[in-house]
Structures are given as structure tokens and as C-alpha cells.
Amino acid sequence: MGFRVLVLVVMATTSALPFTFSEEPGRSPFRPALRSEEAQALRHGLTLLLARRADGQPPDMRQPEMRRPEMRRPEVRQPEFAELSVGQRRWDVDQCMYYCLTGVVGYSYTECETMCT
């Protein structure tokens, strides 16, 4: 786990810190081209990442508006079985299974059977 964090930090710093070439004598030929706000934001993000890793939380650093929406299971509301005839109950379960299995979410047969019955 520690190695993955180290690799993540190295990748983040090397990809987020573009360098410009400087030919001035007496100076390093590479100098960071980041503005201070960008560098501060990067340091803050890495600090949060390391703190979350230390706490055992998942490293989701994206802003809330940039996060992918959570996939929710569709709520399958079943009418009371006492209200329906036997044929109507069978059709509702079959229809529920059909829509569950052919839906975008990709539930297994067992998951659909649990939700629909």
C-alpha cells in the first residue's frame, strides 16, 4: 500500500509540474513553471491524499461536482400481493425480472430474483 502511495505522489508531481528550460548561466536548466496558486493547490491535494491514506479512507480527491454520480439500485416497488390475482402476480414478477436483467446496471440473475420476488 505504501508503494502505491509513493508511485501516486511521484506521478502527480511529475505530471502536474511542467518544467521550462532556462539557459541562464549559474542556474539550474530546469525551473518549475507553476504559479504559486497551482503549487499550493497541489500541495494541499497531496496532503489530503496522504491524510486519507493514513486514516484508511478511499483516495477520492475530486471536487464533489466532478465526482461521478453514485450508481443507485432502482427501487422496485411491488404492490401488495393480496391485491393481485395469481396471473397478475406472475406477470409482474416476470416483467420485473425482464427489466432488471436487460437494464443498464447489469444485475445478475440472483440479484434480480432477490429484488423482484
UniProtKB/Swiss-Prot annotation:
Q: What is this protein called?
A: Conotoxin vil14.3
Q: What is the lineage of its organism?
A: Eukaryota, Metazoa, Spiralia, Lophotrochozoa, Mollusca
Q: Where is the composition biased (Basic and acidic residues)?
A: 62-79
Per the annotation, which location comes first and is thus the protein's main one? secreted
Q: In which tissues is it expressed?
A: Expressed by the venom duct.
Q: Disulfide bonds, which pairs?
A: C96-C116, C100-C112
What is recorded about the protein's domains?
The cysteine framework is XIV (C-C-C-C).
Q: Specify the species.
A: Conus villepinii
Presence of keyword Signal: yes
